[in-house]
Amino acid sequence: MERKKKKVIVGLSGGVDSSVAACMLVREGYEVLGLHLKVLQEGDGSTVLEPSPMTISSREEFHIPVFTLNLAARFRNEVMDYFKEEYLAARTPNPCMVCNKTIKWRGLLEGAAQLGADMVATGHYARTAFIDGRHRLFAGLDRKKDQSYFLWMLAQEELSRTILPLGGLTKPEVRDLARSFGLTAAEKKESQEICFVPDDDYGSYLESAVPGLHRRVEGGEILDPSGQVIGHHKGYPFYTIGQRRGLGTATGEPLYVTAIDPIGNLVHTGPKSALFSTSVEVSHLNWIGIDPPFAPMEATAKIRYRDHASPCTIIPLGPGPTGVTARIMFKEPKSALTPGQAAVFYRGEEVLGGGIIEGALPMEPHP
């Protein structure tokens, strides 16, 4: 008796990575279906699958059924509103990590339920493995493309049904495969922008998303380290920790944004040295590779996507108003620990988990 093929749904964006992932799974013998998640459509959308004319290759071997799922309303509520509210709270959001959890994986698993699929797959550059009774997440082998930082919110339920075919490949290898598979997206350029922010201009996006915002917040005070007013800003939501450009102040030394006060509409500045800290508190912790720790533990952590993983001690603090919290103590000072961004914890190449940065703690003065 012929063994039934496992059915897998691949999230298709129209780009080269997801298309190559789908073709690799076809070659590996899976029954492959494509799912294109529509997130920027008008109206409320629906969660009913609809057939799509999308094709990924001119070769009949890779002609797979493709469906669409309109998640526009959910995307507005879960991602776009979050993005807007974080900036209004003087925080710097990371919409991609939220989208992966609440839109991509949730949508793919909903599609899998409707189509009777066993697994879901994406074109992310990361790896999974089942070791010692736990589904684990690892960095992609291509360090320039590794996307494990954006996947720290995933839980055992999602990882147990996830295939990441590109995790062991480099981007040039993926391009070569795309050409060999006859993919229409083989030479397509990558987009580095947030999909709903035209030209990556988040300031203009906020002004359109919050009518009257500019008039309401422009003209607030810019303060130097002593609290003296040295200028007026364009509106606190348009600044982020570590920013230097756009302050419009003339001082003897370069000044950087060190803190933002949304209630007082104030932007605090200081020298570059004021951006450094060795400790930060994080909330909304999610653990993947280990059970939640109850005692201090050693790891490494990234505080932004392109950051290098720095040695640290994770100190659990227990429940707080923003969820379970921990304090991260770095061995060496880190610059611009920005509220709203993610701190993602690693042990070697394995992602242990992560949390949302709530704020840096002042450095202890040298005796």
Swiss-Prot record:
UniProt-listed SUPFAM superfamilies: Adenine nucleotide alpha hydrolases-like (SSF52402)
Catalytic activity: S-sulfanyl-L-cysteinyl-[protein] + uridine(34) in tRNA + AH2 + ATP = 2-thiouridine(34) in tRNA + L-cysteinyl-[protein] + A + AMP + diphosphate + H(+)
Positions of disulphide bridges: C99-C195
Record EC number: 2.8.1.13
Residues noted as binding ATP in the record, renumbered to the chain: G11, L12, S13, G14, G15, V16, D17, S18, L37, G123
Gene3D superfamilies from the UniProt entry: Adenine nucleotide alpha hydrolases-like domains, HUPs, Translation factors
Enzyme class: transferase
Keywords, comma-separated and alphabetical: ATP-binding, Cytoplasm, Disulfide bond, Nucleotide-binding, RNA-binding, Transferase, tRNA processing, tRNA-binding
GO terms, biological process: tRNA wobble position uridine thiolation
One GO molecular-function entry: tRNA-uridine 2-sulfurtransferase activity
Site (Interaction with tRNA): H124, Q341
Record localization: Cytoplasm
Signal peptide interval: none
Taxonomy, superkingdom: Bacteria
InterPro entries for the chain: MnmA-like, MnmA-like_C, MnmA-like_central, MnmA-like_central_sf, Rossmann-like_a/b/a_fold
Catalytic machinery residues: C99 (nucleophile), C195 (cysteine persulfide intermediate)
Region span, Interaction with tRNA: 145-147, 304-305
Function as written in the Swiss-Prot or TrEMBL entry: Catalyzes the 2-thiolation of uridine at the wobble position (U34) of tRNA, leading to the formation of s(2)U34.
UniProt similarity note: Belongs to the MnmA/TRMU family.
PANTHER family registered for this protein in UniProt: MITOCHONDRIAL TRNA-SPECIFIC 2-THIOURIDYLASE 1, TRNA 5-METHYLAMINOMETHYL-2-THIOURIDYLATE -METHYLTRANSFERASE
HAMAP family associated with the record: tRNA_thiouridyl_MnmA
Name of the protein this chain belongs to: tRNA-specific 2-thiouridylase MnmA
